[in-house]
């Protein structure tokens, strides 16, 4: 597999992480280096590990994973999305919104945005292609796109109405990504 093909796959896989990072950038009040590091590290790590897991899973479980991977990604994204919407209606003054770069929310987003990379790993095993170089490029590309998405999102968050409804906009983006994943897997046709 040539370098251009690997990079093309990496960019395509990074798009979900990029979109989620934009939503996270809008959602967060201020973004520090820790936010950048946590989100980029986790998204990059999960994007790099999933092809390796898929590659080792190989043909033995390929059919099972391919049948349900899109549903897993959708339900994880929907779960996080509905929690964000629920939190947006919590009017308490002392209410603090959950940071998408911490805890269970971070892990769920990392898994949901990297499920497609698992399928890529399965494909690489079928093609008898080594997974190590693609996994490295995929992880680094996802981390870079995540940082770019956070930067774009934080700038977009300066728009007053967008800042006020950031959690709902972010939830909508996550739900849209989940629905797009289902559409790409032929659920709606």
Curated annotation (Swiss-Prot):
The keyword Iron-sulfur does not apply. Disulfide bonds: none annotated. The keyword Zinc does not apply. It comes from the Bacteria. It is found in: Cell inner membrane. Its main location: membrane. InterPro entries: Mntp/YtaF (IPR003810), Put_MntP (IPR022929). Pfam families: Mntp. One of its GO terms (molecular function) is manganese ion transmembrane transporter activity. The chain crosses the membrane at residues 6-26, 39-59, 71-91, 106-126, 131-151, 169-189. One of its GO terms (cellular component) is plasma membrane. It is a multi-pass membrane protein. Probably functions as a manganese efflux pump. HAMAP family: MntP_pump. Belongs to the MntP (TC 9.B.29) family. This is Putative manganese efflux pump MntP. It comes from Desulfosudis oleivorans (strain DSM 6200 / JCM 39069 / Hxd3). The lineage of its organism: Bacteria, Pseudomonadati, Thermodesulfobacteriota, Desulfobacteria, Desulfobacterales.
């Amino acid at each position: 597999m040539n370098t251009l093909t690997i990079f093309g796959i990496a960019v395509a896989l990074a798009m979900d992480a990029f979109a989620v990072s934009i939503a996270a950038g809008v959602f967060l009040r201020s973004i520090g280096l820790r936010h950048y590091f946590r989100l980029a590290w986790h998204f990059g790590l999960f994007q790099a590990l999933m092809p390796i897991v898929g590659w080792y899973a190989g043909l033995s479980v390929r059919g099972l994973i391919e049948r349900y991977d899109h549903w897993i990604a959708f339900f994880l994204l929907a779960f996080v999305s509905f929690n964000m919407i629920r939190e947006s209606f919590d009017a308490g003054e002392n209410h603090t919104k959950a940071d998408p770069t911490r805890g269970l929310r971070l892990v769920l987003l990392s898994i949901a945005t990297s499920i497609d990379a698992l399928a890529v790993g399965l494909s690489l095993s079928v093609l008898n292609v080594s997974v190590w170089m693609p996994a490295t490029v995929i992880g680094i590309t996802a981390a870079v796109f995540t940082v770019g998405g956070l930067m774009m999102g934080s700038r977009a968050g300066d728009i007053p109405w967008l800042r006020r409804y950031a959690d709902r906009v972010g939830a909508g983006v996550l739900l849209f990504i989940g629905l797009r994943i289902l559409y790409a897997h032929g659920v709606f046709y």
